Amino acid sequence: MKELRPVQVILLGFLITIFAGSILLALPIATQSGQATPYIDALFTATTSVCVTGLIVETTMTHWSIFGQAVIILLVQIGGLGVITITTGMFFMLRKRITLGNRMLIQESMGLNTMTGLVPLVKKILIGTGIIEGIGAVLYATQYVPEFGIGYGVWAAIFNSISAFCNAGMDIVRDDSLRSYVTNPVMNFTTMGLIILGGLGFVVWKDLWQGFKKIVKDKVPVKRMIQQWRFQTKIVLSITSFLILFGTILIFLFEYHNPATMESLSLPQKIQASLFQSVTTRTAGFETVAQAALTDASSLVSMFLMIIGGSPTGTAGGVKTVTLAILVFCVLSVAKQEESITLFKRRVPQNLLSKALAIIVINLIVLMTSVLLLLVFDHGTFMDSCYECVSALATVGLTKGLTPNLTIAGKVIIITTMYLGRVGPISMAIGFSQKNKKKMVMYPEQDLIL
């Protein structure tokens, strides 16, 4: 038997975690009624948890017992940080040596270009995650404990904090997500903060933390500190800020007079709700306004934001902010008749452009295929089916109401789409392809008419 490549181990790791979770969720103990959940629904729930999507066929609060909810949030944490990162954390706890093979797996799972400093980075990720989720849980508890009591209030706070940070979008306090809290600033800004921090990526975290220490300890000017950020951080923060602002403005304009969403809200509340919708579409899945009631214009903006998603090495899905930046600046370089792509006075390697194009094309193929199949087997409207499939592929979790009514075929389609969205269609293609030897022959170039 041939040794598995790192990418194959990662693909298999997610599959094993999903199937193990589905078996636990299919047990009678996992439901409040004590009756076993149909396996397809248990598999759907395990997949949406591990893939940190948030599309649900059974209401998390009322259907699942505390045991079932604990299984779900454990799967969310594993899926958000990655199977390999969690496994490495267990090695730390057991004081086991991290081998070269383990380091290669970590590098592949996080999409890093080097193995230098991997082990300290994983330690910082695990510690940072615990601190951020802990702070989030405390803030949620200030709202949940007065409403639900200490026991369930604390449990709901922990559950929602992990879910928000991992960009899963699942909660156990309402059957309408966070719509009851549309005017609550603590709930809104706590959730948005966790979503953004989870979606920025762990590499960006490192730069931000080091920059913060330089400002506080060494009194380094903010401008100089920003100049010292790595190339990746500058791109991620710039694109993330632009997309949040872009989405907020458009959704505010398109929903301002919509009686089913924001018309009854005050001006500050409309801005808050628009900001939340812009942030949550970046693969989180919580909602403070009903997605089915959005105008078509807002739905299109939301789908665009969903497709882009978060940033590399983070908990979010989508094609990623860096991919968008490379493609946008590629178009600008063509318009300016420049031979290379330049961002922040740095040239982007040609192989990254090829990879960015491949990511976009493969994701579009998967998306069109899943929409077509869903239209054939579930007969939903075109907009609802598109919204569902974009949400599944980008691991967002927002729906216009299609998920609970999916047929078995529809559930299989969405399960497959969520898995592909989490591991990445390119990773799947690489995992099933043969590893080719490096070609020693370079063929001559030939021009084409475009």
Language model segments and positions:
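Membrane-proximal intracellular helices of multi-pass ion channels
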Residues: 1-450
